[in-house]
Regions:
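A conserved active-site cap/scaffold subdomain adjacent to cofactor or substrate pockets
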Residues: 191-212, 220-221
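Hydrophobic faces of well-ordered beta-strands that scaffold small-molecule active sites
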Residues: 14-18, 50-52, 82-84, 112-116, ...
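Active-site mouth loops of central-metabolism enzymes
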Residues: 18-33, 87-95, 180-190, 248, ...
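An alpha-helical appendage that flanks or caps ligand/catalytic pockets
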Residues: 2-8, 134-175, 216-322, 353-354
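N-terminal beta1-alpha1-beta2 module of alpha/beta enzyme domains
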Residues: 1-80
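Flexible, glycine-rich active-site loops centered on histidine and acidic residues
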Residues: 9-28, 91-156, 206
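Conserved, mostly hydrophobic/aromatic
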Residues: 14, 42, 46, 54, ...
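Short, acidic/polar
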Residues: 29-41, 191-197, 309-316
Length: 354
């Protein structure tokens, strides 16, 4: 695994996850341009990783294929690690993912992360259209093992895919008599004991998505550590927690932006389209008592406030979990506020300006 050092004065490494949020009044083209700018800002401010997520058929999320956005970012950045957080593997064939991330590793050697999740990243109908009847959720561990074997080109003798090779990759280099290339750094993503135990058994780094729920985080991380088996790529457990954050000089503006994200989640939970409303539209909505409870839950989950207030919460999270890395999930309708969030957190922890 690529070495990871704490960021600035923080006792953990800091990274960024972008969901390609595209709000009301915004185009996907504008979103992609702003993602490039945000990745470059994250690199300049010393963040360790910049990941993109996978979502389908959602008005508020533009990256149905994080690997395509990552391909663009390889040419727009120089040092920061780039990755998918993640590829929802049941939506894909492992060989194709191995090929695509082999290409990314070729474009940015030593900088590519491949986070693997099993959620659909969409609604049931769209998931069915993507998977065409394949019950891939039930075979996620087998899919992961198959993908890892394609990446390393190490299927055992007698395996039906022993003669199938992901290109670019180790087999191509051997055939062409050149140095063996590196492979993407594979992570297991999740928010449950299932994913934690799988990551530990495979000897892979584990990323817990706190933005989806926090009830089992300590249990999941402890299960991962207890289940961990050293592998060729990782000798000891390594953990990352992603968390939704909005920081601003004005705490009330941070809350307004967090409210738009909470409203988007409310809409999805009540079977409305996952739209990211403007702060004005979001604040003008009159929720029912039950809806207000849902909004309050997400407003607690999406950490918002001044840079110091958000950083205090991150410190408490680290103290409670002992996590090695914390990944800031960008939130809100305003890309300017998302950029300000990264600046304020970087300033608080004294991250270098590169």
């Amino acid at each position: 695994m690529h070495p990871v050092a704490p960021s600035g004065t923080a006792p953990f490494a800091l990274s960024v996850l972008d969901n390609a949020h595209t709000g009301v009044g915004q185009t996907a083209q504008e979103t992609f341009a702003e993602i490039i700018a945000l990745a470059q800002l994250a690199e300049r401010r010393g963040y360790h990783r910049f990941w993109m997520s996978e979502h389908h058929a959602m008005p508020a999320a533009a990256t149905s294929s994080p690997q395509m956005m990552l391909a663009r970012l390889t040419g727009e950045t120089e040092r920061i690690r780039l990755g998918a957080g993640g590829v929802m593997l049941p939506n894909h064939l492992p060989l194709l993912i191995a090929e695509q991330f082999g290409m990314l590793e070729t474009l940015a050697p030593g900088r590519i992360d491949l986070g693997l999740g099993r959620a659909p990243g969409t609604d049931h109908a769209t998931a069915a259209a993507l998977r065409r009847g394949r019950e891939a959720n039930d075979t996620f561990p087998e899919q992961v093992l198959e993908l890892l074997a394609f990446l390393e080109d190490d299927f055992p003798d007698g395996h039906p895919y022993r003669g199938v090779h992901a290109v670019p990759g180790p087999w191509q280099a051997e055939e062409n008599q050149v140095a063996r290339p590196g492979t993407p750094e594979a992570w297991i993503l999740g928010s449950s004991p299932f994913s934690a135990q799988l990551a530990g058994q495979l000897g892979r780094p584990y990323a817990f998505a706190l933005q989806f729920g926090d009830a089992d985080i300590v249990t999941a991380l402890n299960l991962y550590r207890d289940s961990f088996r050293p592998s060729e790529t990782l000798s000891e457990p390594h953990t990352l927690v992603s968390i939704g954050v909005v920081a601003h000089d004005d705490a009330s503006e941070a809350r307004r932006q967090a409210h738009t994200a909470a409203m988007a989640m409310l809409r999805m939970l009540t079977r409305k389209s996952y739209r990211l409303l403007t702060p004005e539209e979001s604040m003008a909505y009159s929720p029912t008592v039950q809806e207000q409870q849902i909004l309050d839950m997400y407003l607690r989950r999406f950490v918002n406030g001044t840079g110091e207030q958000v950083a205090e919460h991150l410190d408490q999270l680290h103290d409670a979990t002992g996590v090695d890395e914390i990944m800031l999930v960008t939130m809100g309708h305003s890309r300017e506020v998302q950029s300000r969030t990264l600046e304020l957190i970087a300033d608080h922890y004294g991250l270098p300006r590169l």
